Amino acid sequence: MRAEVAGLLKQASETLIMPRWRALDDADIATKTSETDLVTIADREAEIFLSPHLEALLAGSFALGEEACSEQGDILNRAEDEWVWTIDPVDGTKNFVKGTRQFCSMVSLAHYGTPVMAWIYRPTEKDCLIATANAGVVLMSDDN
């Protein structure tokens, strides 16, 4: 499952996130809770792509995305379900909007609210940090 999730993050990055990096129009950016709480079309599209693909990897799991939570707060009630994926499609949205390199895509998997695994894909570095509970962290790059 480690490689599959990393592959999904890479695919979302290559097709939905990086084509918009340094190429956003004003219409591609919106605010959520305040003028500094930004969301972009890349955030929304990547989350829409990732959610069903992650759920398909683990039967009965539920994907809880940052953007869906900001629009439908009641889905937070599912955070303690048996298997829950959490998705932040573009962490560091302000940096993404500014065109700087300091942003990433993050996914985690929790079992009854306890984190089990986490993935941080850095599109500008083309690598993925993968953490597993009680087993440490590995770095996968597109080169290996």
Cite the ranges covered by each PLM segment.
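N-terminal subdomain of lithium-sensitive/metallo-dependent phosphomonoesterases centered on the IMPase/IPPase/PAP
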Residues: 1-90
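DPxDG-like acidic metal-binding loop motif
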Residues: 75-138
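Short, intrinsically disordered, charge-balanced linker/junction segments flanking boundaries
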Residues: 141-144
